[in-house]
């Protein structure tokens, strides 16, 4: 990722503020940010209320510490995806973080969704499972701990929707891995979050746009809880 892009003048305030908060947390021995968010949800969210969990995570991100969740600004995009998916879709998420997007997709798409979410961080797995439990969605969302490149080959069946929101340099190789293992089929929708210029998404975008395998749409957005330009790429396997 082109980290220098985060140092451009329009992005500098966000970058320095986030780095300051991370340093303070490290020096004071605070838990990782996902675990802080988990504790906040347990304290303030209403059990069994998915929207309350999302609202509480939004409040944490706006008032306590920034979170790299999708945030509320992209909920309309998730709702739009429902029109492209069959009833009771199988969803694969790469990158759980705090469980925000898993909860949002389960709440906004279809009550019969079944989501498998792969996450490499143990803290993120713990936080995601706890937040999903508070939301009352543990029976519909499964979290798998491990590197995506190791877990993907162990998956079975096909997925109607794939949500990419993990390490950006893994977007392209993991998508190709999903293809080679037959985990996506014609009509499968692949949503790649954070493909704005700041994330140096060119290898992934070049692949979905020019491989001839996908129809694809680019939607502008902002990085969650900021005004920094971002984008989402929505691709459908032909």
Question: Each PLM stretch: what is its role?
Answer:
Residues 121, 167:
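Conserved SAM/SAH-binding beta-strand->alpha-helix loop
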Residues 114-119:
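Conserved SAM-binding motif I beta-strand of class I
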Residues 46-49, 63-77:
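Conserved SAM-binding loop and adjacent beta-strand
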Residues 1-49:
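N-terminal auxiliary segments of SAM/dcSAM-dependent transferases
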Residues 170-238:
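C-terminal substrate-binding/active-site "lid" region of AdoMet-derived donor-dependent transferases
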């Amino acid at each position: 990722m082109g980290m220098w892009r985060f140092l451009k003048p329009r992005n500098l305030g966000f970058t320095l503020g986030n780095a300051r908060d991370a340093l303070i947390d490290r020096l004071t021995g605070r838990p990782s940010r996902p675990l802080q968010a988990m504790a906040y949800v347990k304290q303030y969210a209403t059990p069994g209320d998915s929207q309350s969990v999302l609202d509480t995570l939004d409040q944490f991100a706006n008032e306590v510490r920034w979170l790299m969740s999708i945030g509320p600004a992209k909920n309309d995009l998730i709702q739009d995806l429902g029109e492209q998916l069959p009833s009771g879709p199988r969803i694969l998420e790469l990158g759980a973080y705090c469980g925000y997007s898993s909860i949002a997709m389960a709440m906004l798409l279809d009550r019969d969704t079944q989501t498998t979410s792969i996450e490499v961080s143990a803290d993120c797995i713990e936080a995601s499972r706890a937040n999903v439990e508070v939301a009352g969605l543990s029976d519909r969302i499964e979290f798998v701990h491990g590197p995506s490149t190791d877990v993907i080959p162990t998956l079975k069946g096909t997925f109607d929707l794939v949500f990419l929101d993990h390490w950006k340099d893994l977007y392209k190789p993991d998508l190709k891995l999903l293809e080679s293992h037959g985990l996506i089929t014609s009509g499968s929708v692949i949503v790649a979050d954070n493909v704005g210029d700041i994330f140096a998404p060119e290898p992934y975008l070049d692949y979905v746009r020019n491989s001839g395998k996908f129809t694809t749409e680019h939607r502008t957005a902002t990085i969650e809880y900021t005004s920094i330009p971002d984008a989402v790429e929505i691709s459908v396997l032909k």
